[in-house]
């Protein structure tokens, strides 16, 4: 019986899951149970179902962003049109911690070069940033948990493979992270793009 479970775990994901979209109550519960890296979970607005409540609670406990969305939004994201009121967006690779990025730089005897992004919501832009950061020799990229694109299939494709090489960490609060890094002696350079009117 154990061999069958191991084989089942290694089966290729259906196309919908391979691109990071996990649909349906049981599929999302199982993804949470095995520790799949999930960027965000959408739950149908106004649903009071016990199972959806369990999913939301478990996701929040794991630090995953839970968003209530109307059914039209869920239908728009859905690949199977059988989402049962819940869709998880899984990352194409695991996130790391900021500490692990800093440790890797220290092990190499190099001052850490980090690219910190805030509110990069377009996955194509994040993919391009990952590609550029990897080419520039950055030790890692840091993004916020909210108001940012995650490590989706679109980001992976746009990064031209860089997502497989550059570590990416997610943090709850970018300003707090920058203060902590400054206390550790980090120097920061900032680029702001202001909207044109």
PLM feature segments, named:
Residues 1-104:
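N-terminal positively charged helical leader segments and presequences
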Residues 189-196:
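Conserved small/polar residues in nucleotide/adenosyl-binding loops
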